[in-house]
Swiss-Prot record:
Species this chain originates from: Rattus norvegicus
Role according to the record: May play a role in mitochondrial aerobic respiration. May also regulate mitochondrial organization and fission.
Keyword Cell inner membrane: no
Residue list for modification Phosphoserine: 119, 129
Name of this chain's protein: Mitochondrial fission regulator 1
Length: 335
């Protein structure tokens, strides 16, 4: 494969006129033999591409319908010239556009040649033409005539205004001779009635503290509402001294207890709260041992309920002894 590529390259270089040795082994960094591409370019005769050429022409040599074949070369005037006579928006050369035939009814009009963007200064545009000076004088005359008409209109408006001002006081005098009936204003509404005084507080022997607190709270709320209507103010915080002021005069009713309430209730075996309380008492009995010894030394009698209490069905006595509780009690007593 490599040999075939070498043979192909030798054939190509022989056809061009370049030796293989000079291409591969010549390492000159200058001249036309610096690279293979430069060598091929110097030996091959390449045809240059055609370039665009622009030519400036005068008005006399522009295209005309009588001489369609002349001035075929594109110029700078043709670059931005757009044909708008047929409603088209595409850019074309002036040589490709044909003028429309003139109508019979309309008189021939001289069209303005297409405008060109010329960067060279034009001496003809610097001098003002006599036609433009005449047009400016006519415009000034028209403006002065309009100003005179405006001044006359202003004078007429001022006369009309003065006549209206003179007629208005005379009409006012005529109106003043007629009697004018004045309607009296409506009387103001009567003031609101004052709030009723609070009822006197009567203490009954059967009233309780809750009733007194409720009454005082209602009185305070009613007084606060009246104050908010007249003078909106913030309500003060309730004072316990005012609430408990008449507590000494309150008499409590004696309540008779039934025999069932006096007797101690028997402990329910199925009550979980009682079982848990009894278990906790048994568990933490060693903590109150020192207190019980002190009470025995002082001679404080034990309550009969403890002595006559029945043994609990649930507690640490139902568990098997492991010896850990005794060790704990001994450690606590030693400490």
């Amino acid at each position: 494969m490599l040999g075939w590529i070498k043979c192909l390259m030798r054939m190509w270089f022989q056809r061009v006129g370049v030796s293989m040795q000079s291409v591969l082994w010549s390492g000159k960094p200058y001249g036309s033999s610096r690279s293979i591409v430069r060598k091929i370019g110097t030996n091959l005769s390449l045809i240059q591409c055609p370039r665009v050429q622009f030519q400036l022409t005068s008005h006399a040599t522009e295209w005309s319908p009588t001489h369609p074949g002349e001035d075929v070369v594109a110029t700078f005037a043709d670059v931005g010239w757009v044909a708008t006579d047929e409603g088209e928006c595409s850019t074309r050369l002036r040589t490709e556009v044909r003028s429309k035939p003139p109508l019979e009814n309309n008189p021939p009009c001289f069209e303005k040649p297409p405008s060109r963007h010329i960067s060279l200064p034009n001496s003809s545009q610097d001098k003002p033409s006599p036609k433009t000076t005449l047009a400016s004088e006519e415009a000034l005359q028209k403006i002065s005539a309009l100003e005179n008409e405006l001044a006359a209109l202003r004078a007429q408006i001022a006369k009309i205004v003065t006549l209206q001002e003179q007629q208005s006081p005379s009409a006012g005098c005529l109106d003043s001779s007629t009697p004018v009936i004045v309607v009296p204003p409506p009387p103001p509404p009567p003031p609101p009635p004052p709030p009723l005084p609070p009822p006197p507080l009567v203490l009954h022997p059967s009233t309780s503290a809750l009733d007194l607190i409720k009454e005082r709270r209602e009185q305070r709320l009613s007084a606060g509402k009246t104050l908010a209507k007249g003078h909106p103010k913030k309500l003060d915080m309730p004072n316990m001294l005012e609430i408990l002021k008449d507590m000494n005069s309150v008499k409590l009713r004696p309540v008779k207890r039934s025999e069932k309430d006096e007797k101690p209730r028997p402990v329910d075996i199925t009550d979980p709260a009682a079982l848990i309380a009894e278990a906790l008492k048994k568990k933490f009995a060693y903590r109150h041992r020192h207190n019980s010894q002190g009470e025995a030394e002082r001679g404080i009698p034990k309550p009969e309920s403890d002595a006559t209490s029945e043994p609990a069905l649930f507690g640490p006595h139902t568990l098997k002894s492991t010896g850990k509780m005794k060790a704990l009690i001994e450690n606590v007593s030693d400490s």
